[in-house]
Amino acid sequence: MGYEAGNYDVIVVGAGHAGVEAALASARQGAKTLVLTINLDMVAFMPCNPSVGGPAKGIVVREIDALGGEMARNIDKTHIQMRMLNTGKGPAVRALRAQADKFQYQHEMKKTMENEPNLTMLQGMVDHLIVKDDECKGVVTQTGANYRAKSVVLTTGTFLKGRIILGDLSYSSGPNNQQPSIKLSDHLADLGFDLVRFKTGTPPRVNSHSIDYSKTEIQPGDDVPRAFSYETVEYITDQLPCWLTYTSLETHQIIDENLHRSPMYSGMIKGTGPRYCPSIEDKVVRFNDKPRHQIFLEPEGRNTQEVYVQGLSTSLPEDVQQRMLSTIPGLENVQMMRAGYAIEYDAIVPTQLWPTLETKKISGLYTAGQINGTSGYEEAAGQGIMAGINAGRKALGKEEVILSRSDAYIGVLIDDLVTKGTNEPYRLLTSRAEYRLLLRHDNADLRLTELGYHIGLISQERFQAFQQKKEAIEAEKKRLYSVIIKPTAETQEFIRSLGGSELKDGIRASDLMKRPEMNYESVVRLAPAETPLPSDVCEQVEIQIKYEGYIEKSLQQVEKLKKMENKKIPDRIDYDAIKGIATEAKQKLKEVRPLSVAQASRISGVNPADISILLVYLEQGRIAKIAE
């Protein structure tokens, strides 16, 4: 027999990386928010790699921070190492990556949530949704507690019908041997949602005391203090190194000899795995010409001896894993503390979502994270903050927010999911973004902080500091556009010392900065500012001036896109009434129900000819609609 347990504006189901961002975003907007999670000891748990950031993903973390989210602040307080990647490349692909103390990361995030006004945390498993007239009204837990809400966000990770597979052993489980969620998955199917079966995996963990580090290569963090959050002022300087080693031909031989025992190749695993994070057995089979593969040894925290063996994700039997490890330089006598495993789980087909992450089928129900078919903590957190923002705004009677592909990598991620769908765990890559020169690590605040402030997630104090930074950037750019550097003997000597060609005439400081050998620091040696500027202001000035032409070209492309985005497609349009559109295109348009012509043009199977016919039809104004 059920009972009424409470009323809230928003309920978030799950407290992983999507759930914590969703809950905090909702509560910080003023919505009374409840988080229900299977185990309160596992808030923001990292079941796989103990790291945050990397190419594209690191930019997402910055975007979450610019909007007012928590992931960046939390990793800045709890990392053991920080590195800027791709420093030898252009600003569009630079990205920050941090090794996390995974246990401290959990502890700090749970503390943040416990201290958040408007946020209640409860341990409990949700079995059903309360749905009436295609509207989600709340949830029911396995104990029969009925919690009512105006919006519900599902962030269930890999728990939906989770199944762990290790060799020929298979059992129902969430990650790290936690309870799986069985009934909720069946309930979603009963409600009419299309589900898919995906798979991911994790490598073994080994005892640091048993590693011979003299046979590995040290991978230290950066000497320059770095941070993900724009608010961080205190930097961790006591960093721990990671270590690099490689598989050997003997490792590959053991894998080849035991492929018949691999669940991936025996048919035990039915779910589709991540393309960009293959298992070691997959790598050995697919790249059999490679004599070795990189293995990174990553400490899981400051107060544990467990080391994550990155690059060795596997579901081979335990005895094979131990033999495999002993063939890797430095790991000959290693003690395996936890075996690697694969986990299968249910996810929903994400084309069943609007760009707000609300489901099309049931109003007031939102989904975020791995339930939407993505992989990665950062992708989950990016969806989480947007689902939390929109669930909170819907509950409070406010207009929902959609990030476009030109606004943020989060916008690219969500648009890809809801427009194209995915047939494998989706990973965000820089190559997925058309406007990556605009979506940089360094300018996330310039792109999104104003929006975060208007939503209510950025404080007045932080917003004022942001405005001062913007003004300082514009003032310094204006100065450099007007200052003329004359070809004095001293100037010519300095330019020659940098490998540049001498000036023929006076030149604007901004034009001099565009030379490949020049940067902001070298230009201000010749044209000093009245007072030294903060490093983040200097960085912005340099990038905006140096890449001015390319940035301008990208902005022109964005303007064209916006014109297409502004051509809205009416709700309930009857595509069958439009003559000339190909049958496949009609099927896809009816399935996705795009909100704009631009979104329609990105659907797989919809061709330019179909878009031209759609545009003509919309301009005629006589639009047939299907009955509600």
From Swiss-Prot:
NAD(+) binds at residues 273-287. FAD binds at residues 14-19, 126, 181, 370. SMART domains: GIDA_assoc_3 (SM01228). NAD-binding protein involved in the addition of a carboxymethylaminomethyl (cmnm) group at the wobble position (U34) of certain tRNAs, forming tRNA-cmnm(5)s(2)U34. HAMAP family: MnmG_GidA. GO terms for cellular component: cytosol. Belongs to the MnmG family. GO terms for molecular function: flavin adenine dinucleotide binding. This is tRNA uridine 5-carboxymethylaminomethyl modification enzyme MnmG. Keywords: Cytoplasm, FAD, Flavoprotein, NAD, tRNA processing. Its cofactor is FAD. The keyword DNA repair does not apply. One of its GO terms (biological process) is tRNA wobble uridine modification. Homodimer. Heterotetramer of two MnmE and two MnmG subunits. It is found in: Cytoplasm. It comes from Bacillus pumilus (strain SAFR-032). It comes from the Bacteria. InterPro entries: FAD/NAD-bd_sf (IPR036188), GIDA_C_N (IPR049312), MnmG (IPR004416), MnmG-rel (IPR002218), MnmG-rel_CS (IPR020595), MnmG_C (IPR026904), MnmG_C_subdom (IPR047001), MnmG_C_subdom_sf (IPR044920). Signal peptide: none annotated.
